[in-house]
Amino acid sequence: MIKKIWFLVCVFVCGVANATVDTSLVERAEKYLNSITGLVGGFVQTANGRDERGDFAMLRPGRVRLDYANMPIQLISDGDDLYFFDKSLDQITTVPLTSTPAGILVRKNIDLHNADINVVETVDGNNSFSLKMNLKGQEGLGYMTVVFDKKPVKLNSWSVDDATGAKTDVVFNNLKTKTNFGRDYFQIQRHKTISTSGGDDFYD
């Protein structure tokens, strides 16, 4: 499961041929995402038929935190990098936030027509709609689909598919707005010293 979590962190792209894109749905998603400052709630992650639950928080620009209930794992972004923290080993692995699914959702200005983002497919359902996305420069590794409830528009879930067809779903629940977090909430607390503060053009 930890391997699947790491895949969820890293993979975010793939082309989809002959798909249709409804620009009005893209604009609705973009408007909603730009209206969010902070969220907290729960999540259920499903991979290989196994569920893992935990707590989710985000604060734009650039901050994300996922705490897994039954594993010693945290994912925390400080606005620059995303840290995969294995508490049992007191070990941190770092990737640029811009290369992850979460990075799209917490940019300072979310522009889904940005040169580095491709919305390759939209699906309009009765109660929800979804956007399938990829990032340029990482084609062939997988793709991400973000699902939004319609009435009112709000984040429902995201899923990541790799090139082999393996899928990881993250469904959010009980999401509420929140902007007042503790000063160190989006920083890792560990035995060894590491700087977890920074930023870049997307998140400053």
What would you call each of these model-derived segments?
Residues M1-K4:
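Positively charged n-region of N-terminal signal peptides that target proteins for export
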Residues A19-E27:
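Cleaved targeting-peptide boundary
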Residues I36-G38, D51-R53, L59-P61, N70, ...:
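Extracytoplasmic
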Residues D55-I104, T168:
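An acidic-aromatic
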Residues H113-T122, N126-G198:
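Gly/Pro-enriched, hydrophobic low-complexity segments
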